Design a protein with these regions (language model features):
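Exposed, interaction-prone regions of secreted/extracellular proteins
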Residues: 1-250
Length: 250
């Protein structure tokens, strides 16, 4: 499908999506698309479209998932094919100061021993990003371990990244790593990991409409929780998206 913003969305059979390229997932069934909801959370409500590709009214049929097609020029912007769609190894990111001249940020966080999920609502803006070396985002971030080699991170939110997507549109994204961004993990569905179950939401696709100063406001609410079956499950706007099977090393 051709999206009004220029993206091409492919409807891929659920069992043929990139996650099942992983040796430990080959031949397995996709995650349950109606997982048990945590106490205190509402079940699925009437879904309000929030992505540009859905404004035409088209969607993918049942049994398939919508995957944004990667363009050749997007891969060429990466430092290497291996690094495409991945963050580079980093030191400590989780800082509460804003003294850097290059990285302006604000962080709210809680520490504890046993968290089985989190929920965040984020206002969606479309700030101008000048070049491929800049980005803007709002995300929730669930981590364990230290910022050494044992960091595990699960992330989701919206981001504007000309380096990754080639434009200045805010896009719904996910990310994961199990070794502090060294060799594992990626954005969205650009490697084996995230198993998508929803046929109406495309991870990596543009969000529309967005908030305006003094005008109407738009947000996205994301819920991530761990099931008793050891799956990490994602919901956005009260609709299940998919998740990760932690038994497979994610």
């Amino acid at each position: 499908m051709q999206s009004p913003d220029g993206d091409i969305i492919d409807c891929v059979l659920t069992h043929k999506q990139p996650a099942f390229d992983h040796p430990l997932l080959r031949g397995q069934k996709p995650l349950d698309d109606h997982p048990e909801i945590p106490k205190g959370q509402n079940g699925e409500e009437e879904f309000e479209e929030f992505q540009a590709w859905r404004t035409t009214g088209e969607t993918c049929p049942e049994g398939t998932v919508p995957i944004r097609r990667t363009r050749e020029e997007e891969m060429l912007r990466a430092s290497s094919v291996r690094r495409f769609g991945r963050k580079g190894p980093i030191g400590s990111i989780l800082r509460t100061d804003t003294t850097s001249n290059f990285h302006e940020h604000a962080v709210g966080y809680v520490n504890g021993d046993r968290y089985y999920g989190a929920k965040a609502s984020m206002n969606v803006w479309a700030p101008h990003v000048a070049n491929t070396q800049e980005f803007s985002l709002s995300q929730m971030w669930i981590i364990s371990g230290s910022f050494g080699g044992d960091l595990n991170s699960i992330e989701a939110g919206w981001q504007i990244s000309p380096e990754i997507y080639g434009d200045n549109r805010p896009r719904f994204f996910t990310y994961w790593t199990s070794d502090a961004y060294r060799t594992t993990g990626c954005y969205n569905l650009l490697c084996s990991g995230f198993v998508q179950t929803n046929n109406r939401i495309s991870i990596g696709a543009a969000i529309s409409p967005t908030s305006s100063y003094g005008g109407r406001q738009y947000d996205i609410s994301i819920l991530i929780w761990k099931e008793v079956s050891n799956n990490l499950v994602y919901r956005i706007r009260s609709v299940g998206i998919g998740g990760y099977n932690l038994d497979q090393g994610y």
